[in-house]
């Protein structure tokens, strides 16, 4: 029987795969996903289905917006996955394929197609599946009201074998955290822009002083 990896093992493997400093704004999502993927890797009944793949892609992209340098997020996701036995390329391809399929269906056809993504009997639920369902609804619908989309996701979750109460709670938390993240990124970008303007002003003043 293979040795069971601990969270310390996963963290060690992660830092070896991603030996970069993570800014405080993004450290929380990195820590949360590392722990979540670690726990899921030990769930015998967990299946990394399409809903999970879309949810992981959505959560990661939502909470790493504004990340610098721009080439680091891909490496960060790869490290989070590989340190817990997941294949990030396979998951990204599954998510992209699923999102493209969702965009190509009419409303009725979408619901029929969506049932193909149902959770198998007895399979372990992950909050990322709820986010994946919401993302598929966003991709397939012209509906722009976030609350309406969440309510629809909760209703559809029953037919997909997902626990509706947990889906509702998980999507409410996801929505709230997304709003806070957007505000934090906006504030960070405004602060960086202000710092750049101050630096440019100092350089201009120094140049004028030298010229004079």
UniProtKB/Swiss-Prot annotation:
Record GO cellular component, one term: plasma membrane-derived thylakoid photosystem II
Acetylation keyword on record: no
GO annotation terms (biological process): photosystem II assembly
Taxonomic source organism: Parasynechococcus marenigrum (strain WH8102)
Family: Belongs to the THF1 family.
Function: May be involved in photosynthetic membrane biogenesis.
Name this protein carries in UniProt: Protein Thf1
The keyword Cytoplasm appears for this protein: no
Residues forming coiled coils: 179-201
Organism placement in taxonomy: Bacteria, Bacillati, Cyanobacteriota, Cyanophyceae, Synechococcales
Keyword annotations: Coiled coil
Top-level division of the source organism's lineage: Bacteria
Pfam families per the UniProt record, alphabetical: ThylakoidFormat
């Amino acid at each position: 029987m293979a040795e069971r990896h601990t969270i310390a093992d996963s963290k060690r493997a992660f830092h070896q795969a991603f030996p970069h400093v993570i800014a405080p704004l993004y450290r929380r999502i990195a820590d949360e996903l590392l722990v979540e993927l670690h726990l899921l890797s030990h769930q015998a009944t967990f299946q990394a289905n399409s809903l999970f793949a879309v949810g992981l892609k959505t959560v990661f992209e939502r909470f790493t917006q504004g990340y610098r340098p721009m080439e680091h997020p891909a490496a960060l996701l790869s490290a989070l996955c590989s340190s817990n036995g997941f294949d990030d390329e396979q998951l990204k391809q599954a998510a992209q394929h699923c999102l493209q399929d969702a965009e190509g269906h009419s409303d009725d056809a979408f619901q029929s197609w969506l049932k193909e993504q149902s959770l198998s009997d007895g399979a372990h639920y992950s909050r990322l599946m709820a986010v994946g369902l919401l993302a598929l609804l966003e991709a397939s619908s012209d509906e722009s009201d976030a609350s309406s989309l969440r309510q629809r996701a909760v209703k559809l979750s029953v037919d997909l074998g997902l626990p509706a109460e947990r889906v509702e709670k998980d999507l409410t938390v996801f929505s709230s955290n997304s709003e806070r993240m957007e505000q934090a990124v906006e504030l960070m970008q405004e602060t960086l822009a202000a710092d750049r303007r101050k630096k440019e002003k100092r350089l201009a003043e120094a140049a004028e002083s030298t010229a004079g």
